[in-house]
Amino acid sequence: MKVFILTEGGKNIGFGHITRCRGLYDALKEIGIIPVFLVNGDETCKHLLRDTNYLVIDWLKEKEFCFELIKGATGVIIDSYLADEPFYLRVSKCCKTPIYFDDTKRLSYPRGIVVNGAPYAHMLRYPKRKDIKYFLGMRYVSLREEFWEVPQKTINMTIKNILITFGGMDHYALLNRIVVTLKKNFNFTFIKAGTAETRVVVTKMKSLIHKADVCISGGGQTTFELARCCVPIIAICLADNQLFNLRGL
């Protein structure tokens, strides 16, 4: 069975798409299906792809190579903000079952399956079509294997330990202001942009989350992992595509 996952990520655009797709990769592997990751990214994303079958390639520039590679596949999953409608249409013609991760009803998708695991997904009013199946709402959130089972969390009413993570995006000025404000009264751990989820292995990230009394985070994929661990979140909208997610929460 040939299954491909097309996505993107890196220091300049963050790692949320790769993180989400890694969860699906882990789930498919669990049932004996080993997909191939095709990742439009840079060196900073490779640690997220550790122990997977992957190829780092700009599949938007190498379209013909990509289409030839996925031709006849059982399934192709796309998680992208960069691919346009013609690209999706071409993919839908190359495989039996195309699957599209979506966050904002970004495109008019061709035939296939649209997955939006955000809490606001039903409010987007996707068009009803016979050739598209929709999987909407938080029951379809894709989490990495390390977050499938988590220890029970005790919520501390007194905040002592704070975790700060903004994913792969570089928000140094904002981070610096937060650190200056907190450093006199709290213990805090922060994960710098470019190292988040790359040099910090997932198991350590999970441990840091569990130890935190509260987490200051961006409003992307990390919020779902924090919610899974039952950690109180102060979420900050760091990009336009996070706004719907935070409104839904």
Regions found by a protein language model. Give the residues of each.
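A nucleotide-sugar donor-handling region in carbohydrate enzymes
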Residues: 110-171
